[in-house]
């Protein structure tokens, strides 16, 4: 086979994958905020609070679900998926996360809302099917919320963790890259870790349009804008390595196991994002990184059963890394 033939076949494969993703992805993104699973919602009796935290940058109060880990405890911020709801955080809807981390010495912080936001500070108002609002989520999570929690709930404003699934996995990495004093730990579960590359901006735009009618250009501008690379975890590996951020990176391969998630959309999407995770690992190792857990099992689909299992599995690592006691 000639070099030209190889290149043609390679481009053909990329085109087929990209076309399939463009057709299927908008219908899949709901998986990141789908129906509740067994054991969802915190049980009665747990000390879960429903806070209204002022956000001057967004011009409104933001609902935050909160469970204290004790005075001066480090915080674990659990960030939601693309279809984040305005009533409850997906981690509470779909997993017993508050139960798992009760009396762990860690304060659990679940911001509510932020559909399609990537927990970022948007260039323009976030205008979707429900109207327009200001999205300054990075400012809220790294300034307004930690200050409020420190003053009102005795939570340490530094030495925290950000854990996110799908959309929010890349967000967790970026928060840690640019705010290393606050976030010394970042967990990414089934995320696209090179959103600025290739068809990433176009596919993200399609997904955001389906999840609320939002526009990616309102978030980070056109694909040529520096904001795309600024918010690309793979591009920010040098910062994560220099910060010595503790990382937990998980992605399945689209094959279901006994946990469930046996449906074609969940299988396709997990397999689709896996390659970006493997590339991230290679780039991280090449940059001299040595403070990460990479978990890429030969199973796992894009569904809450697997993300919940990972949150449970990382509990000891979080306690050790954050100094919970």
From Swiss-Prot:
Belongs to the mycobacterial A85 antigen family. SUPFAM superfamilies: alpha/beta-Hydrolases (SSF53474). The antigen 85 proteins (FbpA, FbpB, FbpC) are responsible for the high affinity of mycobacteria for fibronectin, a large adhesive glycoprotein, which facilitates the attachment of M.tuberculosis to murine alveolar macrophages (AMs). They also help to maintain the integrity of the cell wall by catalyzing the transfer of mycolic acids to cell wall arabinogalactan and through the synthesis of alpha,alpha-trehalose dimycolate (TDM, cord factor). Its main location: secreted. Pfam families: Esterase (PF00756). This is Diacylglycerol acyltransferase/mycolyltransferase Ag85B. Disruption phenotype: Cells lacking this gene produce normally mycoloylated cell wall components. Transmembrane segments: none annotated. Residues 98-108 are annotated as: Fibronectin-binding. One of its GO terms (molecular function) is fibronectin binding. It is found in: Secreted. InterPro entries: AB_hydrolase_fold, Esterase-like, Mycobacterial_A85_antigen. Disulfide bonds join 127-132. Was identified as a high-confidence drug target. One of its GO terms (cellular component) is plasma membrane. Keywords: Acyltransferase, Disulfide bond, Secreted, Signal, Transferase. Residues 1-40 form the signal peptide. One of its GO terms (biological process) is response to host immune response. Gene3D superfamilies: alpha/beta hydrolase (3.40.50.1820). Substrate binds at residues 82-83, 166, 194, 272-275, 279, 302-304. The gene is fbpB. It catalyses: 2 alpha,alpha'-trehalose 6-mycolate = alpha,alpha'-trehalose 6,6'-bismycolate + alpha,alpha-trehalose; an acyl-CoA + a 1,2-diacyl-sn-glycerol = a triacyl-sn-glycerol + CoA. Its EC number is 2.3.1.122, 2.3.1.20. The active site is at 166 (nucleophile), 270, 302.
